[in-house]
Amino acid sequence: MIRLPFRDGYYEVRPTKIIALAKNYAEHAREMGSEPPEEPVIFLKPPSALIGPNSVIVLPRRSKRVDHEVELAVIIGKRAKNVPAEKAFDYILGYTILLDITARDLQAEARKKGYPWTVSKGFDTFAPIGPRIVDKRELDPSDLEIGLKVNGKVRQLGRTSEMIFKIPELIEYISSIMTLEPGDIIATGTPPGVGPLRHGDKIEAWVEGIGVLEEEVIAEDSILC
C-alpha cells in the first residue's frame, strides 16, 4: 500500500487505472520521431506498477533499454463522466509526480509489429509516485518547472505550460471515453530529454510546488537468488 502525505494526514493511492499521455510535449514528440498529435494520445499503465518515494525501480531482464519520463500527475477526486473542460477542476483532488518508466526497446519492437505497447509500460515498479499530493486549491498547475536528474545531472527540464493539451482538455477527452473514478491518476506527459537508466542510478524528479521524488535503480538480475 502506498500512502502519500496529503493535507494534514495521508492519502492511500489506490487507483482503478492510470491514464498516461504520449507526446503531450511537442519537443518530446519530436525526439521520439513524431510530430505533435492533433488529439490526445492516451494509454494505460497498471496500478500494480506503482511504487512510493524512496523505493527501487527494477530494470527487467527482458529489456536492454529502460528510460525515465517525469510527469505531473493529476489525482481524480470524484467520479467523472463526460465532464466539460470548464468544469474539469471540480473533479481534481490534487497533484503529484509520476515517473512513466518505459522499456524503450520493447516499445519500439511492439510499434514495428503494429502491436499495443503495454508490455513496455507495465512492468512492476514502472510507475513511481510521490513525494506527496498537493491540494488542488494550493497549486496552479498551468506553468510549473518540471525536471529530472540522474546521478545529479539534469536530463529533463521543461515547464507544464509547454503541454499541448492542458489538464481541462485532458479530463474532458478522457472522461468522454471512460469513467474516471476517485483516486484514478492522469499522467500528463513528459518534457524532452528522456534517456536510459542503469543499475545503481539515483533519480531525483521534481515539479515546482510539489517537491522531489527520489528513487534508486537496480537490475533484476542483481536481486535474483
From Swiss-Prot:
InterPro entries: Fumarylacetoacetase-like_C, Fumarylacetoacetase_C_sf
GO molecular function: acetylpyruvate hydrolase activity; metal ion binding
Binding site for a divalent metal cation: E69, E71, D100
Record's keyword terms, sorted: Metal-binding
Family, as annotated: Belongs to the FAH family.
Pfam families: FAA_hydrolase (PF01557)
This protein's name: Uncharacterized protein PYRAB13970
Signal peptide: none
Lineage: Archaea, Methanobacteriati, Methanobacteriota, Thermococci, Thermococcales
SUPFAM superfamilies the UniProt entry points to: FAH
Classification via PANTHER family: ACYLPYRUVASE, ACYLPYRUVASE FAHD1, MITOCHONDRIAL
Organism: Pyrococcus abyssi (strain GE5 / Orsay)
